[in-house]
Curated annotation (Swiss-Prot):
PANTHER family, per database record: GLYCOGEN SYNTHASE, GRANULE-BOUND STARCH SYNTHASE 1, CHLOROPLASTIC/AMYLOPLASTIC
Domain of life: Bacteria
Biological function: Synthesizes alpha-1,4-glucan chains using ADP-glucose.
Protein name as annotated: Glycogen synthase
Residue stretches spanning the membrane: none
Record pathway: Glycan biosynthesis; glycogen biosynthesis
Reactions catalysed, as given in the entry: [(1->4)-alpha-D-glucosyl](n) + ADP-alpha-D-glucose = [(1->4)-alpha-D-glucosyl](n+1) + ADP + H(+)
Top-level class of the enzyme under EC nomenclature: transferase
């Protein structure tokens, strides 16, 4: 399974190989550093949130310059969709962590994915993190320690038929033990750890240390001890050579008590050591309104008819009265972090001002119930779907005038970028990646205070713009030109990779090809 990233061109070494007469005898083909990208989600197979999209997109553009392999747990839903999987190695267990095999599959576009094959831990119904009743797996500490230990062993040259990376890139708490296991195993390969959401820390009891085969030093405050528990996330922060977050503003915010989730001290230390930076996410090249096959009709900044066709579809699909006032959209998990309660609080004022509201997503039961009740009280003005469907979401982005994102915090956010691509202006709280990707009054609307009144003021500004068609269209055009695709935003990662590799002794840079 796989897909191609638009705009991939033949790299110079491949051209020279295809035409030997062009190859000068003194010019050997360029060597490519090997990168191991460790993740718990890959949207080709399994996706819970933005990590799955990130893990599918970034390695694909990185492999233009590097030799990249993704390492992923062999979940049941992954194995069911794999073709031509072959076993390339095996790794022993440690303490209560069972042994595993390493499988390799090459996706249709050439991306190589290694799977940690451990049926005891991964072949289950449910999501990567929860059972089908929504409860965390009680052995998550073992499940993801197995992933991290496998990554560390591969970094040390074991388990992958001699394939050894020159750099390891781990992501979020499920793979955060990777840099720590590397350090404890004496593997000096450089490591990068990306924080996608600091609030999810991978906590377990101190007594789990024996099951995880941890050394005594792991129990220190300088390593992964966190208020009497063990934190996978803190282990990644403490032991990785460099830390990134998914936006520049979020990188600053998490060094403060307000946003640091108790880890602001160690993160401030990383800033002082110049080991923490923010890189804004890009988006997949498929988000192109002029050629998106999911849409009812395609459109561009020069031709709006297709956008109106998507609006009519959304109106009919959600039972809204046609063409009466601006259409506001919520495309989000229905959880407190996303500020859904604030949207409910201002909804009556929004509707009284002539607005209409459509929502798609699922989340906390009380917020799902409140959204359904809002739709029941306002038929023709509010439409709600509990659940998520990619095609419906894209049509809502395309058909709406404004996207509501009153997030309490937002490490990066992708919805505002998708909305901008499709000419829907985001209305968002000025935090994290929202602050980095929205220009207030130009490509969307920002508000600062975490209050319903501040939020409502921004909504009313948007309604005023809606009633000025020339200004609305000008903002739409600027918004559609604003988002960066991964093909544009990959270079900061390339620079960081090169710096980490350059600052490591040549003998420790791993095998290259």
């Amino acid at each position: 399974m796989g897909h191609s990233v638009a705009g991939v061109c033949l790299e110079e070494p491949a051209v020279l190989t295809a035409f030997p007469s062009l190859l000068h005898p003194q010019d050997p083909p360029q060597q490519r550093d090997r990168i191991l990208f460790v993740t718990a989600e890959l949207s080709d197979f399994v996706k819970v949130g933005g990590l799955g999209d990130f893990s599918a997109a970034l390695p694909r553009v990185l492999k233009r310059e590097h030799s990249v392999r993704v390492l992923l747990p062999g979940y049941r839903q992954v194995l069911e969709r794999c073709r031509d999987l072959r076993i390339i190695g095996s790794l022993p267990g440690r303490a209560a962590i069972p042994p595993c095999e390493i499988g390799l599959v090459t996706l249709d576009d050439g991306l190589e994915v290694m799977l940690v094959l451990c049926p005891l831990l991964y072949e289950r119904e449910g999501t990567p993190y929860m059972d089908d009743q929504g409860n965390d797996w009680p052995d998550n500490h073992l499940r993801f320690a197995r992933l991290c230990l496998a990554a560390a062993e591969i970094a040390g040259g074991r388990g992958a038929q001699g394939w050894q990376p020159g750099l390891v890139h781990a992501n979020d708490w499920p793979s955060a033990l990777t840099p720590a296991y590397m350090a404890w195993n004496g593997v000096r390969t450089p490591s990068l750890f990306t924080i996608h959401n600091l609030a999810y820390q991978g906590l377990c009891d101190l007594q789990c240390s024996a099951e995880l085969g941890l050394p005594d030093e792991a129990l220190s405050h300088e390593s992964m001890e966190f208020h009497g528990r063990l934190s996978f996330l803190k282990a990644g922060i403490a032991h990785a050579h460099h830390i990134t977050t998914v936006s520049e503003t979020y990188a600053q915010e998490i060094t403060t008590p307000e946003y640091g989730c108790g880890l602001h001290g160690i993160l401030k230390y990383k800033v002082e050591k110049r080991q923490l930076s923010g890189i804004v996410n890009g988006i997949d090249d498929s988000w192109q309104p002029h050629c998106d096959p999911h849409l009812v009709a395609c459109f561009s900044a020069r031709q709006w008819a297709g956008k109106r066709a998507n609006t009519r579809y959304v109106e009919e699909r959600f039972g809204l009265e046609p063409g009466k006032g601006p259409l506001f959209a919520v495309v989000s998990r229905l959880v407190q972090q996303k500020g859904i309660d604030l949207t409910l609080e201002i909804s009556d004022a929004l509707l009284q001002a002539g607005g209409r509201l459509v929502s798609i997503g699922r989340g906390e039961p009380n917020l799902e119930k409140a959204m359904l009740e809002l739709a029941r009280r306002h038929p023709g003005q509010v439409g709600v779907h509990i659940g998520f469907d990619e095609t419906e979401a894209r049509r809502i982005y395309a058909g709406s005038d404004f996207l509501l994102m009153p997030s309490r915090y937002e490490p990066c956010g992708l919805s505002q970028l998708y909305a901008q691509c499709f000419g829907s202006l985001p209305i968002a709280r000025c935090t994290g990646g929202l602050a980095d990707t929205i220009v207030d009054g130009v490509t969307g609307f920002l508000f600062r205070e975490e209050t319903a009144q501040s939020y409502l003021d921004a909504v009313m500004r948007a309604i005023n713009v809606y009633h000025c068609p020339s200004l609305l269209n000008a903002m739409r055009c600027k918004a559609m030109a604003a988002p960066m695709f991964w093909s544009d935003s990959v270079e900061p990662y390339n620079r960081l990779y090169r710096r980490l590799l350059r600052n490591t002794a040549p003998a420790l840079r791993g095998v290259r090809q």
